[in-house]
């Protein structure tokens, strides 16, 4: 029995040494060996199994190889509890720091470059994190509520969520195109197009938003038309009143000036003050005797008011010229002020004399 155990121990040591050198004894292949159950045999079998599993897991997405560093990077992203951890920046990071972090991570975790399991989800998480944090409004809302929105695994759903309540308004693929023009800056690697339910959700949500916006615009159109009509209503009322007033108004029977367009072409004078005025061809038929006398009183009053206003304007003009001549010591202005005639004032003096004499 002791001899048997000694032989088994020697064979176990040889087997472990062969496993470590990645080869087996030529005379005893591992398939035909039945381990004895001792600690050394079990340890050797466990090391062999671990090595085989690691060799299998190095075959990533799309049967492409990946490095241990890439796998650890994907695992780090999946363990992150907020967008700041995903990008590896502080909560007070500036826009430039966010862009720098995104460029670095997007190139590192793009599925066409990183084939480790979960690289696609990690890449989408990076894009979503940058799209939210680079938007001031979304970042403010995320800072207030985002820490409560951790990743979770819903029943009958895939584990990847990455803060679905704070989805970006742009897909990770579109965001990558914005930064790198659809391909890597250092190679001719075309963009991947992995259309998942996140992309579908994004398109469906924005299609619903556009439809809702169109409905709201259509509902607002009648209200906008009504508001515009209410605003224009006062203007329309003024225009209508003005037109009606002009239609109902009658032209006066006289004019102090010659107006051929209105038919005031016949010249006349008042009997008392000899004030000139103009009438139309039908004036004599309408005004005679007392009616003519009353009308001429009205004409004289209007004429005196007109002459008084004109006289005041002439005096005002002469006074201003005199003041300017004294202020600037301008002899030319002084002469012009002195030569200015007050014709309407002279007419007014004559009318006052006639009224006193009458």
Curated annotation (Swiss-Prot):
GO molecular function, one term: Hsp70 protein binding
GO biological process, one term: cellular response to misfolded protein
Primary localization class, coarse: endoplasmic reticulum
GO (cellular component) term, any one: endoplasmic reticulum membrane
InterPro entries, A to Z: DnaJ_domain (IPR001623), DnaJ_domain_CS (IPR018253), DnaJ_subfamily_B/C (IPR051100), DUF1977_DnaJ-like (IPR015399), J_dom_sf (IPR036869)
Residues passing through the membrane, by range: 228-248
CDD domains according to UniProt: DnaJ (cd06257)
Membrane topology of this protein: Single-pass membrane protein
Phenotypic consequence of residue 110 to Q: Loss of colocalization with SV40-induced foci upon SV40 invection
Alphabetized UniProt keyword annotations: Chaperone, Endoplasmic reticulum, Membrane, Transmembrane, Transmembrane helix
SMART domains cross-referenced by the UniProt entry: DnaJ
Subcellular location(s) of the protein: Endoplasmic reticulum membrane
One protein family per Pfam: DUF1977
Domain J per the UniProt entry, residue ranges: 82-146
Protein task: (Microbial infection) In case of infection by polyomavirus, involved in the virus endoplasmic reticulum membrane penetration and infection. Regulates the recruitment of DNAJB12:DNAJB14 into SV40-induced foci and all cooperate to guide SV40 across the endoplasmic reticulum membrane. The foci represent the site from which SV40 penetrates into the cytosol.
Protein's recorded name: DnaJ homolog subfamily C member 18
Native species: Homo sapiens (Human)
């Amino acid at each position: 029995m002791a001899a048997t155990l000694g032989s088994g121990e020697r064979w176990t040591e040889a087997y472990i040494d062969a496993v470590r050198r990645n080869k087996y004894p030529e005379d005893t292949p591992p398939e035909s060996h039945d381990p004895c159950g001792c600690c050394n045999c079990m340890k050797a079998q466990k090391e062999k199994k671990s090595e085989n599993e690691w060799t299998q897991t190095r075959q990533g997405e799309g049967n492409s190889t990946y490095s241990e560093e890439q796998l650890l990077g994907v695992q780090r992203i999946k363990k992150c509890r907020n967008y700041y951890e995903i990008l590896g920046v502080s909560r007070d990071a500036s826009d430039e720091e966010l862009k720098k972090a995104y460029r670095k991570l997007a190139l590192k975790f793009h599925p066409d470059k990183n084939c480790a399991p979960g690289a696609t989800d990690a890449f989408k998480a990076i894009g979503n994190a940058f799209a939210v944090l680079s938007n001031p409004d979304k970042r403010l809302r995320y800072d207030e509520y985002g820490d409560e929105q951790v990743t979770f695994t819903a029943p009958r759903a895939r584990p990847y969520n990455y803060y679905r309540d704070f989805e970006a308004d742009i897909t990770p693929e579109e965001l990558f195109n914005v930064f790198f023009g659809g391909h890597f800056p250092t190679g001719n690697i075309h963009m991947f197009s992995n259309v998942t339910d996140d992309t579908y959700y994004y398109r469906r949500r924005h299609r619903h938003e556009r439809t809702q916006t169109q409905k709201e615009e259509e509902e607002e159109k009648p209200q906008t038309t009504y508001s515009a009509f209410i605003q224009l209503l006062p203007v329309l009322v003024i225009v209508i009143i003005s037109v009606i007033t002009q239609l109902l108004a009658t032209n006066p029977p006289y004019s102090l000036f010659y107006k051929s367009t209105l038919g005031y072409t016949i010249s006349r004078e008042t009997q008392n003050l000899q004030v000139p005025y103009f009438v139309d061809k039908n004036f004599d038929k309408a005004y005679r005797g007392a009616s003519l006398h009353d009308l001429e009183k009205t004409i004289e009053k209007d004429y005196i008011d007109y002459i008084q206003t004109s006289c005041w304007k002439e005096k005002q003009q002469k006074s201003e010229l005199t003041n300017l001549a004294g202020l600037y010591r301008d002899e030319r202005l002084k002469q012009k002020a002195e030569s200015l005639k007050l014709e309407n004032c002279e007419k007014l003096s004559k009318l006052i004399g006639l009224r006193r004499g009458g």
